[in-house]
């Protein structure tokens, strides 16, 4: 960045103010304890004795006052006013140029730690001269670019001031002259092209220059372009992840309704829930058919089914033929009586308890209500004559093939079965309401 441009007096004053202000940051460091003897190779400045720091701060303040007086005296000839300079009088009183440069200096100290240590050791190993300082600064600055390149001489000056002051010397004025000369010779052209020292205030913060750091910290936020937005699928519903709840449910119940069956007692599972909502006639058919599959050797179930079919009046099916009479098994009355005594009708409601079943079979009025329910079922069956033509033929055959005494026994057994089923449905509805 060597420049042959003759720096103006205004630039000279601003450069001198920048160097003094940056060196003054050292006097603002908090005490961190005694420093070990010898040259400190750590980039971070080590604190000095509080008395030494106070003395250094006083020297820098005196130099700033001298600079202000010099600028005021040269105003008539130069026209440079401290009040119009962004370096001396920032637009924002809360900010200062040394604070802006301090952020850049910290980064340079970390990025160029080894080159700065080597340059500091080289300068202190011989008499401190401007030539030695310039050569070491140029060698170190090749590792940086932009404004970071300008921070190299300032950071190196700060460390030299620290080490020489610790050795009992007073190098402030000498180092101030080194810094101003180097910046005017090697950095004036770059600074003027950037708009002067005032452009330091408009530099982007460190976080914006390293967007990768922000991206790593905010990996839970995704900003997708418009062309790829259609490829993103919405998150799965919680009911999908809990498919184990719906595997045991019938098809008519969705996974979101699993709470209905979870709150029911043990005797009312998904199957009984579905049967409660069905027609009583269909419930009887499902009850008898399901029981037949579970116990093939139990003949009482098929007997009850035949009783229900037998009670369908002949007038409901006048045009039905009777070729299926031989397929209807004939059950004797004694056999039916033994079946009723030894083998109760199987049903999905066996969990209701034996006491309730005994109470139902022991009361005659329950039988009468059951006969009324049987007559009601016969009327409903009559309205479905179109879908039960084949069944009517079998019923007619069974009716003509059975004796009168067997019919009475079968009628009583069917009524008892209907009564049991009605009580079971009522108990199930009561449990459901609870």
From Swiss-Prot:
A motif (BH3) lies at residues 97-113. It comes from the Eukaryota. It is found in: Mitochondrion membrane. A motif (BH4) lies at residues 14-30. A repeats lie at residues 243-253, 258-268. Keywords: Apoptosis, Membrane, Mitochondrion, Phosphoprotein, Repeat, Transmembrane, Transmembrane helix. InterPro entries: Bcl-2-like_sf, Bcl-2_BH1-3, Bcl2-like, BCL2L13. The keyword NAD does not apply. A motif (BH1) lies at residues 144-154. A motif (BH2) lies at residues 190-203. GO terms for biological process: apoptotic process; canonical glycolysis; fat cell differentiation; mitochondrion organization; mitophagy; oxidative phosphorylation; regulation of apoptotic process. Residues 365-382 have a biased composition (Basic and acidic residues). It is a single-pass membrane protein. Pfam families: Bcl-2 (PF00452). One of its GO terms (cellular component) is mitochondrial membrane. The modification Phosphoserine is found at residues 35, 256, 258, 300, 343, 347, 377, 387. The chain crosses the membrane at residues 409-429. Monomer. This is Bcl-2-like protein 13. It comes from Mus musculus (Mouse). The gene is Bcl2l13.
